[in-house]
Regions:
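Terminus-proximal functional modules
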Residues: 1-85
Length: 85
């Protein structure tokens, strides 16, 4: 798996929980205070586990959870986080 380019992350402001957990991004160069982490819900798993694991991981680096929600059919989970430092 390849790293997520900083320009793409800054443009989209959204990253998958999988990318966070795989270490495919460097948030030290992320220019904004807020970011959205996503995870898919599917058959046999809720999606909350990888989403919350990613949020917990980012909490170690100065980010905090703002809110968790779903939009539309509910198959995609979204966690809004913000940089505290």
């Amino acid at each position: 798996m390849s790293m997520i380019p900083p320009e793409r992350l800054a443009r989209e402001r959204v990253v998958s929980a999988e990318a966070v957990l795989d270490g495919r991004l460097d948030l030290r160069v992320y220019p904004y205070r807020h970011l959205v982490v996503t995870a898919r819900r599917g058959w046999g798993h809720s999606g909350f586990q990888p989403l919350l694991e990613a949020v917990e991981h980012l909490c170690n680096y100065g980010w905090e959870l703002v809110n968790i929600t779903t939009i539309g059919d509910g198959h995609q989970l979204y966690a809004a986080i913000r940089r505290t430092a």
